[in-house]
Amino acid sequence: MKIQEVKRILTRWQPSSFTLYREVFAQYGGSINMHPDIVDYFMKRHNWHFKFFHYEEDDKIKGAYFICNDQNIGILTRRTFPLSSDEILIPMAPDLRCFLPDRTNRLSALHQPQIRNAIWKLTRKKQNCLVKEAFSSKFEKTRRNEYQRFLKKGGSVKSVADCSSDELTHIFIELFRSRFGNTSSCYPADNLANFFSQLHHLLFGHILYIEGIPCAFDIVLKSESQMNVYFDVSNGAIKNECRPLSPGSILMWLNISRARNYCQERQKKLLFSIGILKP
């Protein structure tokens, strides 16, 4: 028996199944890189290998996680697919207190009350940034003024739900090239198109246009459970010529505002990740 298998036995994590993992995720939620639809996509479309584990207490399943390709907790492929690897939020009951037998340096700080053997100063040298419950009145006023100025200059807004996968792929690649030029590589076009096509239902948010031409697009993915909704901005791009109109700030504000309304209507907790805080 391998050492890792012994650790899982000692910490009460049992071998599980994808079906059970999906059920636990639907109840407790987690980060996008732990979402069962994402797992299913990489299992079926890319033949990736996953091992699932669950934690049972008082005849109830209180948590579950997986190991991807015998390497990591979570799906960490941010350079080739639009998936953030900034943090791992594992589906767990709020009252669960346990030891996690597998290592990760991306564990969400939200797990501090739950996972007893994590050394947080080592586990998270850089913290992921989650938006506040509400913006200040000054911030809201500034964004509203920017938005009105944007509209007066010929700006418009369109939901990503109203765009085809091919449209989204073309828009993002064009804006990415405008923003970064040759200084940074975009995702492979085939990967992006296939990902958008198969997981279109997880996309959330808006695209901004100036006089009918796309000028800002953040890839926001939504992970919803019975308890919460986790939104993650995996990447974003803007048209350089439009920077004076602050399209990036406006788009982020619109997407967060829409996410807040979405959660309030469903009486669920909002978790909106915008990435690692820079030191």
Q: What is the predicted function of each stretch?
A:
Residues 145, 167, 247-250, 254, ...:
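Generic recognition of stable, solvent-exposed alpha-helical segments in well-folded globular domains
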